[in-house]
Amino acid sequence: MEKKHADRLRSKFPESLEGKKLICLQIPDNYQYMEPELVELLLAKLGSYMEIPDNEISFMQRVLEPEVMDSLSEAIEYDSMDFIEVNSAFARSAAALGPVFGNVLDAGTGTARIPIALCQLRPEWKLTCIDLSANMLKVGAENVEKAGVRSQISLELIDAKAMPYPDSYFDIVISNSIIHHLPDPLLFLQEVRRVLKPNGAIFLRDLLRPETREIRDNLVKLYAGDCNSHQKQLFSDSLQAAFTLDEVETMVETAGLERLRIYESSDRHWTAERAWCETL
């Protein structure tokens, strides 16, 4: 683990870790000189603090959930969940960062609720909204039609980790809750850097992985208490698949994205943002 994680563990659990040696590892950017088995092992441990039994320390390790919600029933159920307040707050913040006229990318658009809200705030924007789930986009197309914003929104079935767009194409890149779905978000972040104009704006937001299962369960009760059991499980799984703020900062730095402000924006979210500027 990184030294800062080890130091944090020692400060939070001095008695549990007294006399124990914490090994700090840094995975190199270039894997070609490492044994494939070692690379696989190290990558599998990304997002976890250490291998210690739960009865000794209770930091929650990252557990992946499926990258794509692929069935129509899942897309419909996801769209029915109450994200109005969260989506509206996201749209307001994103709108404040971009230019008056903008070519916008929404990566992992899901059912297009956020771009619809953005169209109402920024009628001059043109939004390219991509997702890897055809059924999410199918529901999204219905939402776009009902909202009457087809002239502003283009929905495309595209992998955000390998986008077909030219370099320096977009004025602003936004994404809500895509990163916790990705096994390796670095590929996506590198693509963001490539397709964004050098002076472009960025607004990324996702869930924070809680430090313990107890905190995770309390968040589920607080924010999904009125949901059905399947929706509660979806939220719980998403929290456990998320990253810590330290991990996000490391990934953003490794991807070469500069001048971003990265911060904990709620008790369950992190945000990475950068305002558009007329010139660098």
Where are these regions (language model features)?
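N-terminal, positively charged/glycine-rich alpha-helical extensions of SAM-dependent methyltransferases
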Residues: 56-77, 81
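A short glycine-rich, Lys/Arg-flanked "PGG" loop and its adjoining helix->strand segment in the class I
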Residues: 187-198
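A short acidic, Gly/Pro-enriched loop at the edge of an enzyme's catalytic core
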Residues: 163-172
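Conserved alpha-helix/loop element of class I SAM-dependent methyltransferases that forms part
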Residues: 84-102
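Class I SAM-dependent methyltransferase SAM/SAH-binding core
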Residues: 105, 113-162
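Conserved beta-strand signature within the Rossmann-like core of class I S-adenosyl-L-methionine
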Residues: 200-206
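Short polar/charged helix/loop
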Residues: 1-57
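C-terminal alpha-helical "lid/dimerization" subdomain adjacent to the S-adenosyl-L-methionine
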Residues: 207-255, 261-264, 269-271
